[in-house]
Swiss-Prot record:
A Pfam family recorded for this sequence: CEP63
Segments for region (Disordered): 297-316, 447-467
Naturally occurring in which organism (per UniProt): Xenopus tropicalis
Sorted UniProt keywords: Cilium biogenesis/degradation, Coiled coil, Cytoplasm
Family: Belongs to the CEP63 family.
Phenotype seen when the gene is deleted: Decreased skin multicilia formation in embryos.
Protein name per the record: Deuterosome assembly protein 1
One GO cellular component term: cytoplasm
Polar residues composition bias: residue spans: 297-306, 457-467
InterPro entries per UniProt: Cep63/Deup1_N
Function: Key structural component of the deuterosome, a structure that promotes de novo centriole amplification in multiciliated cells. Deuterosome-mediated centriole amplification occurs in terminally differentiated multiciliated cells and can generate more than 100 centrioles. Probably sufficient for the specification and formation of the deuterosome inner core.
UniProt keyword Flavoprotein present: no
Coiled coil: 8-68, 130-180, 227-284, 337-402
Highest taxon above the source species: Eukaryota
Length: 596
């Protein structure tokens, strides 16, 4: 746990240093960008000022030309308007004359009609009066309009005179502007030549600066990609490590649950056997009584035969027959009850043995799974060690030339190896036949039925040698160190039952201390069995010890890998610092030379 916390703290400190470095690099690049942008802006402002002057001169010339065109158009429009107005006035005068003629004719007709019908039709007179009034109003209106039109005609004649004078002055100004435009065009052509030369020089400098910027940005991006790849690999490795830890904890919990169930079943079996023994003792009591009764009857028969009296013998003969038949009947009933009890006991023991076998099979499966996980962890550690060796070799070869390229290759190899590691983790149990003979031997030992207690001493005396042979045959040098650490792999297992009980107590104490140091957050059950069940307890304790040693090995491997990755990250950070310093010094020298 402390090593994990230390590795996590180191990873966090490395990440903080990386972030600070990236922040410093970004600040330096931004400063350089700001300086270059200021220089470019100054050049652009100069170009824009010159362009503005040119555009202003062009706009002045265009405005003058436009004003001349507008004035010409106005003159043409005024001439056409005057001609049209004169035509309109003539038309209106003709229309007025025509209307006056019509009015005169109508007036004469009305006057004639009035004289005719003045006497008979008063209503017609009133109408004629109204029409006369309306006609007089119309005449007055036409007179007022004619006055206004005369005023407008005079005003337009004055405007025509003023426009003629303006046209003359504008023609003089146009000639002056044409002369000025020619001079401006000559100046513009000279300024354009100068500006084109300055623009070409500035563009060449801009291209060179942009190339330098692109190269620096590409190096920074490549470094950022490398850092992100390293971070992603570290995250994936931590996630896989956490998942393996969770799976190991789940398997340990299942193993403990199965061990508890097996302990409970064995305790129930032990109780049932004690009950059977008590029943057998109770059944033996009437058999002993029968034997005593038979002895007494034999003594009585001998005494009575010694007396030799036939009459008394005949009298007592039916009584003796009754006494002899009664114990025979009792013995027959007792034998029947014993057979029935034995059959019931056999059925109960068979059911309990089947449950125990099922539990042992489950325990065997769990141990197989744990061993499969050990195999995957071993493969992962081998691959990581191989990759680290390749990293060291490539680093020693390419340290002077191109370290970032070797790190990219290592990252690519790590990414290519990750799916193989996941495939090994997800492989079925059947693929682990090369490493799992110990598992099959353990399962076979669990599947064996339990013998009578009378042979328990012999089994205990034979067990250590067989277990040592199978263990040495199946597992190689990896498990020898664990075997030397375990306190129960001693030759004292084949001794008497008192020594076995002491050994079990020592094992329990050692396991409680070991579990409290390794797994302080878990409540692990103590492994304690009776002295008459020492065989099963040794098997289960050996399985638990192998799991604990595998877990300890996995933690050591993970801490070692974390430290190696920290070293790799530190080396990469140092290289990034060197690259950033070299780029900064390069740009500083370039900026100084440019200022010079």
């Amino acid at each position: 746990m402390f090593t994990n916390i230390h590795s996590i703290a180191r990873n966090s400190s490395c990440e903080n240093e990386l972030e600070e470095l990236m922040h410093q690099i970004d600040i330096m690049v931004s400063h350089r960008k700001v300086e270059w942008e200021k220089h470019v802006k100054v050049l652009e402002q100069k170009l824009e000022a010159q362009d503005r002057e040119l555009t202003e001169a062009r706009n002045l010339v265009d405005e003058k030309n436009h004003e001349i065109g507008i004035l010409c158009k106005k003159l043409e429009g005024v001439d056409t308007a005057q001609h049209e107005m004169a035509q309109n006035y003539e038309r209106q005068l003709q229309a007025l004359k025509f209307q006056l003629c019509k009015l005169k004719k109508s007036y004469e007709k009305l006057h004639f009609h009035q004289e005719k019908h003045q006497k008979n039709e008063n209503a017609a007179q009133e109408r004629s009066r109204c029409e006369l009034q309306w006609l007089t109003q119309k005449i007055e209106e036409f007179k007022a309009r004619s006055r206004e039109w005369e005023k407008q005609r005079v005003f337009y004649q004055d405007q025509l005179k003023s426009l003629d004078e303006q046209r003359k002055t504008l023609a003089e100004k146009c000639q002056l502007f044409q002369k000025e435009s020619l001079s401006y065009q000559e100046q513009l052509s000279s300024q354009k030549q100068l500006q084109s030369e300055a623009i070409t020089n500035n563009q060449s400098e801009m291209r060179r600066l942009r190339c330098l910027l692109d190269t620096s940005q590409e190096t920074i991006r490549s470094d950022g990609v490398i850092i992100e790849n390293l971070k992603s690999t570290v995250k994936e490795i931590t996630l896989s490590r956490d998942s393996l830890k969770d799976e190991n904890q789940q398997l340990l919990q299942e193993l403990r649950r199965c061990q508890k169930q097996s302990q409970n079943m064995e305790a129930q079996l032990y109780k049932a056997k004690l009950e059977l023994q008590s029943c057998n003792d109770l059944l033996r009591v009437p058999a002993l009584e029968e034997r005593q009764a038979q002895k007494e009857t034999a003594n009585l028969a001998n005494q009575k035969t010694a007396q030799g009296e036939e009459a008394s013998f005949q009298v007592t003969d039916p009584r003796m027959n009754y006494m002899t038949s009664e114990p025979e009947h009792k013995s027959f009933n007792l034998s029947k009850s014993e057979k029935y009890q034995a059959e019931n006991d056999l059925h109960g023991t068979e059911a309990k043995n089947s449950d125990l076998e099922r539990l042992r099979k489950d325990i065997g499966d769990l141990t197989a799974k744990l061993n499969q996980k050990d195999v995957t962890i071993a493969t992962v550690s081998r691959k990581v060690s191989r990759l680290e060796r390749e990293l060291e070799l490539k680093g020693a070869q390419n340290r002077q030339t191109s370290m970032p390229l070797s790190q990219k290759d290592v990252i690519a190899e790590l990414e290519s190896e990750m799916p193989q590691i996941h495939a090994v983790n997800k492989a079925p149990q059947t693929d682990s036949g090369e490493v799992d003979p110990w598992i099959s031997i353990k399962c076979g030992e669990h599947d064996k039925p339990q013998k009578h207690r009378s042979f328990h001493g012999e089994n205990n005396s034979l067990k250590p040698t067989n277990y040592a042979d199978t263990r040495n045959h199946s597992v190689g040098s990896e498990w020898e160190s664990e075997k030397s650490l375990c306190p129960w792999n001693t030759p004292t297992l084949g001794s008497a039952t008192d020594d076995d009980c002491d050994l079990v107590d020592n094992e329990n104490e050692w396991l409680s201390l070991y579990n409290s140091t390794l797994y302080p957050g878990l409540d692990l059950p103590p492994i304690s069995y009776a002295c008459d069940q020492l065989k099963d307890s040794t098997n289960s304790s050996l399985a638990g010890s192998s799991l604990i040693s595998a877990a300890e090995k996995f933690l050591l491997e993970e801490t070692r890998r974390a430290s190696d990755f920290e070293k790799i990250l530190n080396s990469h950070i140092e290289e990034m610092k060197r690259n950033s310093e070299s780029t900064v010094s390069r740009y500083q020298s370039h900026g100084q030379s440019r200022h010079i």
